[in-house]
Amino acid sequence: MNSTPDTFQRPALRELTPLEARVLGVLIEKQHTVPDTYPLSLNALTAGCNQKTARSPVMNVSEAEVLTAIDGLKRLSLASEGSSSRVPRFEHNMNRVLGIPSQAAALLTMLLLRGPQTAAELRLNSARLHGFADISSVEAFLDELAARTPPLVVKLPRAPGARESRWMHLMCGDVAPDEAPAHGAHEDAVPPSEFEALKAEQKALTAELAQLRALVEYMANELGIDVGKLTRGV
């Protein structure tokens, strides 16, 4: 930290599209989590954008759409294409372009990928990118990102019934607090078909458990064993 006001003054970038933000976040995340395959191929980058976990909202985009987003990030110098491989591979330049340290980049990445989060959630979710000692250190870097001109993040008003305020990124432009996604609204939602399957499985397991209990009682009676004493550990 210990940033001076001068380091906050950076040329303003245009607002990113939601897919550009997702692509940028994936590039930064995978640099840390799968360094052996970084820079990323188009196929790997698209798969990262379409992940069903650790993403909010969940997307389903094509390689052509990802390429368009990459072109947009290239024009902003936020991404570039490597030249050392026969297969096109892509990498990010966010830390250099925005002039932010790796700790702040880790937090911004999680906001790009997962949407609004509390400082505690950000500390947990960013652990693979950077290990923060405590929530106070997370909040300190968030405060620095919010103090930049223009700001990169904003602290949202605490929602009714919530214990903590959430933070969200501003890379896609300003968002009114009432337009921010509801907490957990897109996180790992269970499709109706899967929910019905889980209910059916629970029902089958309950019936199987009842049959097993009946069998145990029958065998205990045949052997003259008091089942009640067994369940009490006697």
UniProtKB/Swiss-Prot annotation:
Q: Which SUPFAM superfamilies has this protein been placed in?
A: Winged helix' DNA-binding domain
Xref: InterPro entries = DUF480, WH-like_DNA-bd_sf, WH_DNA-bd_sf
One Pfam entry for this protein is DUF480
Q: Which Gene3D superfamilies match?
A: Winged helix-like DNA-binding domain superfamily/Winged helix DNA-binding domain
Q: Which residues form the signal peptide?
A: none
| HAMAP family on file | UPF0502
Q: Into which family does the record put it?
A: Belongs to the UPF0502 family.
Protein name, as recorded? UPF0502 protein BPSS1373
Show the taxonomic lineage. Bacteria, Pseudomonadati, Pseudomonadota, Betaproteobacteria, Burkholderiales
